[in-house]
């Protein structure tokens, strides 16, 4: 992965023009975390451990990404990159489970993270 200019990320993190976008991304990450945690518990009861692992991984990266933005971490761009990739993968898993709400939450989060990465690059 190409190393990003973390100094530029820190400057952009406090730029008033992107604060609203970051707030939206934080909310999307937290929503995706909650949806994936909820689905993981239901999926565990249904006996699909391979799906549970993906849902839990997605929930974890979403929460970590939200926290990195909340504390204005210089590394939040890296978190957003990882979150975008994991959420995209998880959305596909949710599609195979027939869970449109979970897939939509994952895709919304992935899109928000992708927008943050574009803005800070």
Which ranges hold each PLM region?
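Amphipathic alpha-helical hairpins
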Residues: 1-121
